[in-house]
Amino acid sequence: MLVAALGVLLYRDYVREADEPEPLAPAAAAPTEDDARREGFERAYARGQWGRNKQGKGSSGAGSTLESTRVYRVFLQDFLAAHEIRSVVDAGCGDWEFSRAMDWTGIDYLGLDIVAPVIEANRRRYGAANVRFAVADIVRDDLPPADLLLVKDVLQHLSHADIARVLAKLPRYRHVLIVNDVQQDSLSAAYQDIPTGGYRPLDLTQPPYSLRGAKVLAYRLGTNTKLVLHLQGDGGRAGGNGR
């Protein structure tokens, strides 16, 4: 009898446990805006959205080749010397296709990019005592101090909200050089908003931004013009160079 009763109890426990639902796995966290921004740029490189290099891997695009940056590189090299630049933060350094041809002697260079594999490759190929690379989201993260902040071909891929967050960080820099595509005919652009990771020409001297920095260089590339804007002193927000 005791054995039979024990068997009944064990059976009841088994049935009760079998009837209980399995605990649900914790729901995956919804992707944040920061996640979406990183994933957008990672996809661009993975798919070769902006072009591919000689090895067939996604690259920073036609605007970053040695040939297409010849005029810009001459300008930038002269700018570094003329303004006695000793430190540079390159916000959105990309795959360093053209920057490797620059002379960074005597300059502490830090290249930042949101795509980790790009930064890892740059470290292996180009890292030196005065040339460093780090993974960073220039929209979200604080940017290190430097004599010069470079922002080349980056803001044209950001939403208006993300552009505003980057521009808010400029006042700390003595010099800022911003490069974007603008329309050839008027050096202005359509200002529709885009999701970050997309693209549109962008002239920051036009509304809604109306930055009053100096237009120090303009050169043709394909169907667009590259415009280099120099913001000085307080990031271009006062003293005749501001918004």
Where are these regions (language model features)?
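A short SAM/SAH-binding and catalytic strip from SAM-dependent methyltransferases
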Residues: 148-161
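A glycosyltransferase accessory/donor-loop signature
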Residues: 12
